[in-house]
């Protein structure tokens, strides 16, 4: 029970505490002395039976443990060392927290005077663990045992209250007592009549009190049952109210976690989008640079005909400059074939008549194709004769070639001097130089070999004559003409190299244009197949990453990037699943880059 400072029994009992006050008054805790409490305490068993009956709305004769704890909460009963009723655990194995208090109270009550049999039964039932459902005896024992362990002197039990407190009677309609009419006493008179009248009034008052007690008990039991139901509903609402903030807080934490995850995902997507945009800008800038270079090369290619015409003019001017100087005609070579007619008599005189060639004999079996003679030559003799003729002809041809080469060998000094004479620009005797060159051109036979010394002597005389005239052998042109000629030759070479570079660049751009057309064709096909932007961007980014990878050992440059992009697009799953279409049905690309040759 609560402490003395907040003990409700120190004050006049409220109606919600009638049951507590009646129990306290019955067990000697005389703290409420109101008349209704005294009246209710005279029939405590019926009072508890009314309360149990109203709480047992099912009529099963058993009260659930939750309802009993709710009743204790309504009454304000709190056992020492135990939680509030309704908050205790549902596990019966944990034991009844009230048992320790009852045991201690039982030990304290053992020092009191003698207990009757009902008190011992109540204490014994109170020691048991609280079952899931309570019968009326358990309900009665637990409520009475709580006060019995703390009880003082019990109220005296008289004969007038024995019919109420001796046993627990079942609830049934009350029967009025009918007293038999008393015969007048022997000592009749005013005193006897007055005594009889007082006894009758006492009996009537006792019955009235009993009726009032029954009505009060029934009314209070009904009120307690309603309060228990209200407390249970409020406890459920409070439990739900306590659980709702926790559930709301849990949902709020989950929502915040989901929001943080979504924000992180959005941040990653924004960073990825920025990276894709940056790489797309880089690719766009690279394509624009390539396009600008292509246009520059197109402009250079359009200038190529003019460059070719200028190159042809320069070549013609170079030839004209070269032909301005007087050049002697080169020595005409004599025929490498020796004069067979002139050599035939000498050879014939030395060797005699030659046998006819192999073709003259024929290879047939007819008599006309056979060689003349009295006897027919054998095949082995014909072959031997053919080989001897062929060897002799080869040796003669080799001798003639050696003679011709010796005749053609002029001294190097003579050739150099003649070339110097032909390029002299200071008024030398051109006719003499031409005659010498013509003379040298006719030196081809063996009979002219003895004139080489005379030719050298003549050339030396001409050189001395030229030296006396002030014309050196190596004075071909003036320094200004030589410088101009060298400048023209350098310009010609630079133009030729530039032309080669332009041609190589044109070929490279042609390859680049073809690869661009292939890539644009694949992109058009993928767009017709409704490829997603995410997949297309992923292909582009993976291609750029592969080309920018330092471990990439392949070629670099726009053509390599386009080649890698073409392979990546060609390996797309959509194109593999697409049925192969004929090449004639491929759409024409509007964005081609023509390069004029």
Swiss-Prot record:
Low complexity bias spans: 359-368
Coiled-coil annotated residue ranges, if any: 479-532
GO MF annotation: an example: calcium ion binding
Region Disordered: start-end pairs: 85-122, 160-195, 322-380
InterPro entries linked: CCD48, EF_hand_dom
UniProt keyword terms in alphabetical order: Coiled coil
Domain of life (superkingdom): Eukaryota
GO biological process: positive regulation of transcription by RNA polymerase II
Domain (EF-hand) ranges: 43-78
Species this protein is from: Bos taurus
Compositional bias (Basic residues): 169-181
Compositionally biased region (Basic and acidic residues): 336-352
Protein name as it appears in the record: EF-hand and coiled-coil domain-containing protein 1
């Amino acid at each position: 029970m609560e402490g003395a400072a907040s003990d409700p029994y120190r004050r006049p009992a409220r109606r919600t505490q009638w049951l507590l006050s009646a129990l306290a008054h019955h067990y000697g805790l005389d703290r409420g002395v109101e008349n209704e409490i005294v009246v209710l305490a005279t029939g405590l068993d019926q009072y508890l039976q009314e309360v149990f009956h109203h709480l047992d709305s099912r009529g099963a004769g058993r009260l659930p443990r939750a309802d009993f704890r709710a009743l204790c909460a309504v009454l304000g009963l709190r056992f020492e060392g135990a939680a509030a009723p309704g908050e205790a655990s549902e596990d019966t194995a944990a034991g009844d927290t009230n048992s320790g208090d009852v045991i201690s109270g039982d030990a304290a009550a053992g020092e009191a005077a003698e207990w009757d049999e009902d008190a011992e039964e109540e204490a014994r039932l109170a020691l048991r663990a609280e079952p899931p459902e309570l019968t009326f005896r358990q309900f009665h024992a637990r409520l009475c045992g709580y006060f019995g362990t703390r009880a003082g002197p019990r109220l005296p039990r008289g004969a007038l209250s024995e019919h109420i407190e001796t046993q627990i009677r079942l609830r049934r309609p009350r029967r009025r007592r009918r007293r038999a009419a008393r015969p007048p006493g022997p000592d009749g008179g005013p005193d006897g009549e007055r005594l009889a009248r007082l006894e009758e009034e006492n009996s009537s008052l006792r019955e009235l009190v009993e009726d009032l007690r029954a009505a009060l008990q029934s009314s209070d039991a009904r009120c307690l049952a309603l309060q228990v139901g209200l407390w249970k509903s409020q406890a459920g609402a409070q439990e739900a109210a306590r659980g709702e903030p926790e559930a709301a807080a849990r949902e709020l934490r989950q929502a915040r976690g989901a929001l943080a995850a979504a924000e992180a995902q959005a941040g990653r997507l924004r960073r990825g989008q920025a990276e894709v945009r940056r790489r797309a800008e880089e690719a766009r800038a690279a394509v624009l640079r390539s396009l600008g270079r292509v246009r520059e090369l197109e402009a250079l290619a359009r200038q190529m005909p003019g460059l070719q015409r200028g190159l042809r003019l320069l070549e013609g001017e170079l030839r004209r400059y070269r032909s301005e100087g007087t050049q002697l005609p080169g020595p005409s070579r004599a025929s490498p074939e020796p004069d067979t007619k002139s050599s035939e008599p000498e050879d014939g005189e030395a060797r005699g008549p030659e046998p006819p060639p192999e073709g003259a004999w024929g290879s047939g079996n007819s008599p006309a194709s056979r060689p003349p003679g009295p006897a027919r030559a054998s095949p082995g003799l014909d072959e031997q004769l053919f080989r001897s003729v062929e060897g002799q002809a080869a040796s003669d041809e080799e001798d003639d070639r050696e003679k011709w080469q010796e005749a053609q060998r002029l001294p190097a000094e003579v050739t150099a001097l003649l070339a110097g004479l032909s390029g002299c620009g200071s008024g030398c005797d051109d006719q003499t130089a031409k005659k010498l060159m013509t003379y040298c051109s006719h030196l081809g036979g063996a009979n002219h070999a003895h004139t080489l010394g005379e030719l050298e002597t003549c050339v030396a005389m001409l050189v001395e004559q030229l030296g006396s005239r002030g014309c050196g052998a190596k004075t071909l042109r003036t320094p200004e003409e030589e410088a101009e000629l060298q400048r023209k030759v350098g310009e010609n070479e630079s133009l030729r190299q530039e032309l080669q570079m332009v041609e190589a660049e044109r070929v490279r751009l042609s390859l680049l244009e073809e690869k661009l057309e292939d890539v644009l064709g694949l992109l058009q096909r993928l767009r017709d197949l409704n490829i997603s932007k995410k997949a297309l961007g992923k292909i582009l980014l993976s291609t750029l990453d592969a080309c920018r990878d330092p471990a990439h050992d392949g070629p670099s440059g726009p053509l390599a990037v386009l080649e890698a992009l073409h392979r990546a697009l060609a390996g797309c799953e959509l194109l593999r699943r697409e049925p192969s279409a004929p090449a004639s049905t491929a759409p024409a690309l509007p964005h081609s880059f023509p390069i004029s040759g």
